[in-house]
C-alpha cells in the first residue's frame, strides 16, 4: 500500500528537515488527535540517513506506528515486551519506553534520530525512563537529534514542554526539554477540511453536576478525594444522567464515558446494561484491558467507561458519542477527550458531545498556558506596545467582543539576533517595581531581576502594618472616583472602601504635565484592567467615564499623617494567606 501524505503532514515533515539542517536543538510537532502522526513518523524514518528509534508509551502506539512504516513497503524492528518482540539492530526500531529503558545494553549502536510519540509524557526527573534512554543514546552519539510529537504541548503542573514557538512567541522557559515547536496544526483546520468528524456539543443544563465549588490543587489538578466528596453530595443526579445518555445512545454505535474518579466510574457502569458496558481504569490488568479494547473496537458492546486512561493512544473510529462526567482542568485535556470521537468512520456524520460537568472550554480555543480563573474568562488577543506581538491571554470582553480586562503579565514575543541567540521581549503588562533600582519585576518575583534586592513579600508587609498603631489596613472591596476644581486647578479623588465600611482616600492634581505623568504612573498603570492598552483621557471627567476599566486593589495600607490617613501601599493580584474582601475561607 502506498500512502500519499496530506498537505499538512508534508508540511510537518518539511519543517522537521529544515529545522535539523540548521539546528541540533530538540524540536516538537503539535498535531491534533486523528491528524495521522504515524504517517509523519513513518515518512521521517524513511528519509533519515542514519538509524532511527521511535518510542511510544503503550504497545498499541508502537504497533500502530510500526504498521504505518511497513505500509510504505519497508521493514523495521520492534522492541516491546508487550508485543513479544525484542529486535534492536535494524535501521529503524519501534520500541516501548518501558522495554527499551530496561534493556539499554541492547542499544549500544548509534542512532541519529530519536522520535518520541506523545512526548508530553516525558518528565523532568532524570531517573525517568525517557531520560535514561535519552542520556544513554546521547552518550553513544552526542549529535543525536530529538523530535517529539504530541497533541497537547501544555500540561497542568508542568507547563509548556517547549520554549519557543515558530510563530514568534515564548511559551516555556529554558528548562523545557524541547527548544522549538516547529509546526502546529489547529483542530479547526482538521474539521473544516474534512479530516475529522464534526463534533456536535450539547450542554446538559437540565441534569448536570455542579463542580463550581472545587478548588484545584497547586499543580492545577483536582484531587480525587475532593471529587468524590462533591459527587457524594450529588449522587442522586448520576442515575438521571445515565438514563439520558442511554436515550441519546440509542442511535449511536460507540459511546465513551469519562468519569471523575474510579468510585464514580464503578457507579456509572453499574447503571448501564451489564452485557453492553465495560470499565477500564488505571488498575485494569493489561491482558484484560486488551480484550476489552478489542471487543469495544469490534462493537461487541456499546459503552466504555474510563477514568482518564484512554485520553491518548487509543483509536476507535466508530465512537460517535462522548459523555463527559468530570471537570477538565485545561483546554488541552478537554480537546484530548473530545478527540476520541472525532476520527472518521464509514457512515459517521458527527460525534455527539454531552457535557454533564459544565466544562467552560471552547473546543477550538487556543491553550493559553495559565489557569483560566473565573468561568467567564475567555482567550483574548493583546498587542504588545513595545514589539507589536499579538499575545493570547485570559481576559474578559463585552458581548460585542470589546476587551475590558486581561490578566497577561509579560509579552510572549521573542527576537533572534544575527548569532541565532533568542531573547524574550521585556515588556511587562503587570509588574512590581524594585524599591532600590525601580526595575519592573514579575508580580510573583521574590528578588529583583536587575539588582538582586529581596522584594517585599505582601504577606510580610501586611503583617507588619497590622502591628502598627498608626497604620490602617483595608481589605478593599471597592473604590469610587470624584473630580473637581479649586484655585490650583483640576483634581481627582479616589476613595477605597473596606468591606466593613471604613474608607481612606487619595487625591491627584492633574494640572501640570508633571502631575499628569505622576498620575499615569502611580494610579493608571497599576489600576488599569487592560495594561498595555492606553486609557485615553484629557480631563478627570474622561477618567470617570471609563471607571469600568479600572480595578480596585486587594489591600490598601495607610499611615496617619497629622489628622489624616495617607495611602502608602496598594496590593494588587494578591495570593497569600490573608483573606480577600467577601472571600469565604474554611
Swiss-Prot record:
Keywords: ATP-binding, DNA damage, DNA repair, DNA-binding, Helicase, Hydrolase, Metal-binding, Nucleotide-binding, Zinc. Its cofactor is Zn(2+). SMART domains: DEXDc, HELICc. Residues 18-171 form the Helicase ATP-binding domain. Optimum pH is >7.5. Disruption phenotype: 100- to 10000-fold decrease in survival after IR. Double radA-radD deletions have nearly 10(6)-fold lower survival upon IR, and the double mutant is more severely affected by UV radiation than either of the single mutants alone (up to 100 J/m(2)). The single mutation is more sensitive to dsDNA breaks induced by CFX, the double radA-radD mutant is inviable upon CFX treatment; the SOS response is slightly induced in the single and more induced in the double mutant. No effect on RecA-mediated conjugational DNA recombination. One of its GO terms (molecular function) is ATP binding. It comes from the Bacteria. Pfam families: Helicase_C, ResIII. Its EC number is 3.6.4.12. InterPro entries: Helicase/UvrB_N (IPR006935), Helicase_ATP-bd (IPR014001), Helicase_C-like (IPR001650), Helicase_Restrict-Modif_Enz (IPR050742), P-loop_NTPase (IPR027417), Ribosomal_zn-bd (IPR011332). Residues 376-425 are annotated as: Zinc finger domain. One of its GO terms (biological process) is translation. Residues 429-574 are annotated as: C-terminal domain. It is an enzyme of class 3 (hydrolase). It catalyses: ATP + H2O = ADP + phosphate + H(+). Zn(2+) binds at residues 384, 387, 411, 425. Residues 241-386 form the Helicase C-terminal domain. The keyword DNA repair applies. Monomer. Interacts with single-stranded DNA-binding protein SSB. RadD contains helicase motifs, suggesting it may be a helicase, although that activity has not been observed. In combination with RadA is important in repair of double-strand DNA breaks (DSB). Has DNA-independent ATPase activity that is stimulated by single-stranded DNA-binding protein SSB. ATPase is stimulated by a peptide with the last 10 residues of SSB, but not when the peptide's last Phe residue is missing. Binds ssDNA; binding is slightly better in the presence of nucleotides. The C-terminal domain (residues 356-586) is required to alleviate the deleterious effects of UV or ciprofloxacin (CFX) treatment in a double radA-radD mutant; its effect on ionising irradiation (IR) survival in the single radD mutant were not reported. Crystals have 4 domains; helicase ATP-binding (residues 7-185), helicase C-terminal (residues 187-365), a zinc finger domain (residues 376-425) and the C-terminal domain (429-574). This is Putative DNA repair helicase RadD. It comes from Escherichia coli (strain K12). The lineage of its organism: Bacteria, Pseudomonadati, Pseudomonadota, Gammaproteobacteria, Enterobacterales. The gene is radD.
Amino acid at each position: 500500500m502506498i500512502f500519499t501524505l496530506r498537505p499538512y503532514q508534508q508540511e510537518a515533515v518539511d519543517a522537521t528537515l529544515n529545522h535539523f539542517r540548521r539546528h541540533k536543538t530538540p524540536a516538537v510537532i503539535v498535531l491534533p488527535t486523528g491528524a495521522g502522526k504515524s504517517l509523519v513518523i513513518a515518512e521521517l524514518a524513511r528519509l533519515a540517513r542514519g538509524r532511527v528509534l521511535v518510542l511510544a508509551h503503550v504497545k498499541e502506539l508502537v504497533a500502530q506506528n510500526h504498521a504505518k512504516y511497513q505500509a510504505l513497503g519497508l521493514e523495521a524492528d520492534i522492541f516491546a515486551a508487550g508485543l513479544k518482540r525484542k529486535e534492536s539492530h535494524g535501521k529503524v526500531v519501534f520500541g516501548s519506553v518501558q522495554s527499551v529503558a530496561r534493556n539499554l545494553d541492547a542499544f549500544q549502536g548509534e542512532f541519529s534520530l530519536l522520535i518520541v510519540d506523545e512526548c508530553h509524557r516525558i518528565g523532568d526527573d532524570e531517573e525517568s525512563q525517557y531520560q535514561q534512554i535519552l542520556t544513554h543514546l546521547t552518550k553513544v552519539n552526542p549529535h543525536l537529534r530529538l523530535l517529539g510529537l504530541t497533541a497537547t504541548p501544555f500540561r497542568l503542573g508542568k507547563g509548556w514542554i517547549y520554549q519557543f514557538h515558530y510563530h514568534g512567541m515564548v511559551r516555556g522557559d529554558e528548562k523545557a526539554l524541547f527548544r522549538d515547536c516547529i509546526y502546529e496544526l489547529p483542530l479547526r483546520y482538521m474539521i473544516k477540511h474534512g479530516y475529522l468528524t464534526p463534533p456536535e456539543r450539547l450542554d446538559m443544563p437540565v441534569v448536570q453536576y455542579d463542580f463550581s465549588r472545587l478548588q484545584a490543587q497547586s499543580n492545577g489538578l483536582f484531587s480525587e478525594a475532593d471529587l468524590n466528596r462533591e459527587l457524594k453530595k450529588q449522587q442522586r443526579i448520576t442515575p438521571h444522567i445515565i438514563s439520558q445518555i442511554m436515550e441519546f445512545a440509542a442511535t449511536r454505535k460507540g459511546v465513551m464515558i469519562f468519569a471523575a474518579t474510579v468510585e464514580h466510574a464503578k457507579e456509572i457502569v453499574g447503571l448501564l446494561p451489564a452485557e453492553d458496558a465495560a470499565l477500564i481504569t488505571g488498575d485494569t490488568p493489561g491482558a484484560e484491558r486488551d480484550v476489552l479494547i478489542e471487543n469495544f473496537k469490534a462493537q461487541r458492546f456499546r459503552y466504555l467507561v474510563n477514568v482518564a486512561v484512554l485520553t491518548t493512544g487509543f483509536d476507535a473510529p466508530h465512537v460517535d458519542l462522548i459523555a463527559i462526567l468530570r471537570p477538565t482542568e485545561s483546554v488541552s485535556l478537554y480537546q484530548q477527550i473530545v478527540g476520541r470521537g472525532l476520527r472518521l468512520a464509514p457512515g459517521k456524520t458527527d460525534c455527539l458531545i454531552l457535557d454533564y460537568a459544565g466544562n467552560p472550554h471552547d473546543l477550538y480555543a487556543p491553550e493559553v498556558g495559565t489557569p483560566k480563573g473565573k468561568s467567564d474568562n475567555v482567550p483574548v488577543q493583546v498587542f504588545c506596545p513595545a514589539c507589536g506581538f499579538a499575545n493570547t491571554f485570559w481576559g474578559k470582553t463585552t458581548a460585542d467582543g470589546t476587551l475590558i480586562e486581561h490578566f497577561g503579565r509579560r509579552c510572549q514575543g521573542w527576537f533572534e539576533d544575527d548569532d541565532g541567540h533568542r531573547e524574550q521581549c521585556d515588556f511587562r503588562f503587570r509588574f512590581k517595581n524594585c524599591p532600590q533600582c525601580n526595575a519592573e519585576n514579575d508580580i510573583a518575583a521574590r528578588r529583583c531581576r536587575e539588582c538582586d534586592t529581596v522584594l517585599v513579600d505582601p504577606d510580610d508587609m501586611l503583617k507588619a502594618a497590622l502591628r502598627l498603631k498608626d497604620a490602617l489596613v483595608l481589605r478593599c472591596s471597592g473604590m469610587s472616583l470624584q473630580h473637581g476644581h479649586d484655585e490650583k486647578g483640576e483634581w481627582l479623588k479616589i476613595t477605597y472602601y473596606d468591606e466593613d465600611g471604613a474608607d481612606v482616600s487619595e487625591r491627584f492634581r492633574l494640572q501640570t504635565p508633571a502631575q499628569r505623568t505622576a498620575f499615569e504612573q502611580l494610579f493608571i498603570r497599576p489600576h488599569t484592567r487592560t495594561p498595555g492598552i492606553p486609557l485615553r483621557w484629557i480631563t478627570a471627567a474622561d477618567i470617570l467615564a471609563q471607571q469600568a476599566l479600572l480595578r480596585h486593589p486587594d489591600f490598601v495600607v495607610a499611615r496617619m499623617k497629622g489628622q489624616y490617613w495617607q495611602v502608602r501601599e496598594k496590593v494588587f493580584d494578591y495570593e497569600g494567606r490573608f483573606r480577600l474582601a467577601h472571600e469565604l475561607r474554611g
